[in-house]
């Protein structure tokens, strides 16, 4: 049973290859991180879990957002809204931002795109020679 959601696994590829991304069933793959927390609340997941920062627990004090350099709220806005706009709508919206907000948007979007490209290989299955 997998734990990857749309933001982590589906777009950013933020999982361990041949690790937590290798599962038979991925029930929450189409949910954004915020939706996973909402489902958890409905299911009665303890608040101590729902309010703790997302972490792969790779080292003491590690959090996903610190490691990524961008919040999951931004990733959700970027993948769940911005990338679904057509090019003209994207450009119009970006031009509506003041200089400070545009710089922040560009910085966070660049991080998302960089992580997405860097981890794209994780979204492909292993190569096979097909010699038999």
Which functions belong to the PLM regions below?
Residues 1-132:
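ATP/NTP-dependent adenylation/nucleotidyl-transfer catalytic domains that generate, transfer
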